[in-house]
Amino acid sequence: MNVSRTRKKLYPPVEARRSGNLTVSDLHEIYWEEAGNASGLPVIALHGGPGGGSSPEMRRFFDPRRYRIVLADQRGCGRSTPFSELRENDTWKLIEDMESIREHLGIEKWVVFGGSWGSTLALAYAVTHPDRVIGLVLRGVFLLRRSEIRWFYQEGANHLYPDAFERYVAPIPEDERHDLVSAFYRRLTSDDRTERLKAARAWAQWEGETLSIQGPRVRPPRFEEDDFVDAFARIECHYFVNGGFFEEDGWLLKQAAGKLNGIPGTIVHGRYDVVTPLTSAWELKKVWPDADLKIIADAGHSSLEPGIVDELIRACDSLADRYA
């Protein structure tokens, strides 16, 4: 990282110029929106979680004069319906939805941008639809391996944030703490809304308190909203107990070896990312020679930390220079 250069900042806020709801099954409707230049370089920005939903800030990583910016709320979250729904909700359905949106909007190929779980989904899409990907921009790489889930939700990150971890495990009795993800899942799928929300708040707060090393750790406002934390925690936990719905542990990294050849990409990762440690980005780079790995010395996991913002925008600008 060149610390002497001026860091790029988010582009000014831009409003969606059109939006809609796409029926993707008898059960699910997906909210989508477009911003920026209708004739620009298409990009789909994938939100995290899963279950996090899109936000207006996600549009601001792209030059609206040069990009056709597509956002969508994945199944069960944001403005998609039914809300917090776990049925028909898995990685492969989300990839099908991406293809449905692409076809609905008449896009042949697009840049795929995603952070955290968004990087997981972006990679899964790229290895199954490489002919539809112009380039990848990934942040906070998460390969959804058991070791990554155990690090953050069971044993690892607790040594760095023992205070926050104590609050996280509070809803779970001592005799169930040997498998916290399963214990949370039982509560997050309970019919008792009070019990479900108590668990959801603890789950979301844990992630919210460990996102950033920049200044005081202030949770994003939506981490205080009951509807948000309900969907966020339920859907995340649903994917984690099911191993991301991949065939085997480590499937994504194995598929990336070879199948990403020829796809240009940038991986941006905070040196002190506690949520998704740097190991996964490092291992991904080893099997993806066309990728450029940017390690940010003064950043954690959040997409809004200054060093992360700078490199993400530089990566997106570079793709626009090349393809727009």
Residue ranges and their predicted role:
Residues 108-147:
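Conserved hydrolase catalytic core segment
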Residues 8-30, 236:
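N-terminal cap/lid segment of alpha/beta-hydrolase-fold proteins
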Residues 131-184:
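A catalytic-pocket lid/entrance helix-loop region that shapes and gates access to the active site
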Residues 92-110:
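Conserved acidic catalytic loop of the alpha/beta-hydrolase fold
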Residues 291-324:
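Catalytic active-site module of serine/aspartate enzymes centered on a nucleophile-bearing elbow/loop
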Residues 24-82:
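Conserved HGGG/HGGXW glycine-rich cap/lid loop of the alpha/beta-hydrolase fold
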Residues 260-261, 267-269:
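Short beta-strand/loop motif that positions the catalytic acidic residue
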Residues 274-280:
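Conserved alpha/beta-hydrolase "acid-adjacent" motif
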